[in-house]
């Protein structure tokens, strides 16, 4: 059948290598091809197309033999990785441009953050309060390690934590993806010790007068201040990310103009690409730069004909660095594995290469499982199940070859096997290990397609960032021309795929099809774009994957593979700069809007609350309340709390439901009884939570009506307690926002 012919093409015996130059040995079993690998502009010509040498203009320069030794091999590899062929000068100029992009982005996000909060002039308490919700929770563990007597004692404290989910003792390093805080705390301690040793001042402090009858505060600036150090490292990392984007665009398109397009598209759509300048401590701020590196490595592996062990090791390390800081990383990698499997099924990569990629992902998953102290969510994830299913399907390839079906039917069969197998294995492993921590993700996705509602799902969907993508978002993409450019590129890739598939289904002659199914990296990027689009449409927060990937895809406007027919008539530079000039009209306006954001952080009601807790309650007093407020109480007042904003644990979700019953219509004695079981001493009540409504059906009493229909129609408990907290609670503190209720024990 057709499949057997295609299989012969994929797994045919390799040609003997030419002794053109020395290079590192490929992995055992890898196909050996000509020693000079073909880059994006040096692919063999298709039948009926003139070769590169036959074009008008200067002849392409041949690559010089790589010098002997490790340094020579590294230099040659760097030239190749950047898609360059004209010597070291072009390589270093490319790296210089990448460094400039990194510096520019670092300066941009640093200035935006300072403009928004006036962070350099805030007191320590104000800086901590500026890290709201889960940001404050994550920063609290950095603070714990920094202030501990020693680094190891600080790590032991966060691994045996009683403040976060009192009275439970939990390993927060296992639960909350805190390796970034551990690493940054170690760097901070090393930095301050070295600076103290050599006598260099690391921070400058002064008194800031706030006016309006407020007491003066002490404000410190410099890397010796923990909060400043923490934020500075995050911004440096995300500055380096822009260098990766430049290299990524350059490599994918085969032109430094492609790198320029990627970087400028990112800046022109900056508000849609990242939120690191507003929310530095979020997990994505640490994790996403390593996804950019990881996808660059995947692109390199797909493009090259020889598969080197070093590339796979680098991919494994980048996988680990991407997964360790962020619990959501596994879902992103699931979309990548699905895209790669689709690329394999239709014939753009061979079995051997996909097997090595799958093994690399498996190894990185196991490493993360070990480093996360056996976090079972990793092994029971859809990502892990997908890896196992694809591994099994690759092992069963001979059985698929024996199926007497058409090529198209076989593609559908393999896709259905992967989908059904992944879902089934995920369900089985979750039941076997008794894991329900990620059940809310399935419920959230179900609610997007059906009318399913429950308490946890509504807490997510009532937040704007977890709602569907805004209707204005595609319009904003269109105004900067990002969407039209990407659509043109996707159309060009789609045309290539259709032509390739026609050849495969028609069972064309083998060596002709060999050229047609090259460049699987382009197909992978198109499929990955579709996956990110689906995620971004379903959950607005996830457009932070979609928009940067669109910027990377935009670099392909410089690709001769896709637009060689156009560049034969018009100079590529003219096309690119014309497009960038049109993009800059709205893009510069977007940047100006960001630069015009000027403010200063202030939250006097919460400052009063924290100061009262510090001075009027015992150190072991236990608090409950809204998740964002609890993060601040733990961080700044150092008091035990029973709930917090990290919602990815089934037990914590059950605790939060009990705590939030204060905003239900239940009887006060029932709520009090449950709070006493959690050993709560004080409850921080916020009247705004009782009346706040982001959209119909999204006030807390309305959410509780779905969960507790028996009490629907009654007066919400929070409304009753705002007026009079007796006899079950005693009001011990109150200001314009917060009301602290002491739980009366009888």
From Swiss-Prot:
One of its GO terms (cellular component) is endoplasmic reticulum membrane. GO terms for biological process: protein C-linked glycosylation. InterPro entries: Dpy-19/Dpy-19-like, Dpy19L1. Its main location: endoplasmic reticulum. GO terms for molecular function: mannosyltransferase activity. The keyword Cell wall biogenesis/degradation does not apply. Residues 1-68 are annotated as: Disordered. Residues 14-27 have a biased composition (Pro residues). CDD domains: Dpy19L1. It catalyses: L-tryptophyl-[protein] + a di-trans,poly-cis-dolichyl beta-D-mannosyl phosphate = C-alpha-D-mannosyl-L-tryptophyl-[protein] + a di-trans,poly-cis-dolichyl phosphate + H(+). It holds the Pfam family Dpy19. The chain crosses the membrane at residues 93-113, 139-159, 227-247, 248-268, 308-328, 329-349, 357-377, 378-398, 405-425, 481-501, 520-540, 562-582. Its EC number is 2.4.1.-. Pathway: Protein modification; protein glycosylation. Disulfide bonds: none annotated. It is a multi-pass membrane protein. C-mannosyltransferase that mediates the C-mannosylation tryptophan residues on target proteins. The reaction occurs on the luminal side of the endoplasmic reticulum and involves the transfer of a mannose unit from a dolichylphosphate mannose (Dol-P-Man) donor to an acceptor protein containing a WxxW consensus sequence. C-mannosylates the first two tryptophans in the WxxWxxWxxC sequence motif in thrombospondin (TSP) type-1 repeats of UNC5A. Regulates neurite extension during development. Belongs to the dpy-19 family. This is Protein C-mannosyl-transferase DPY19L1. It comes from Rattus norvegicus. The lineage of its organism: Eukaryota, Metazoa, Chordata, Craniata, Vertebrata. The gene is Dpy19l1.
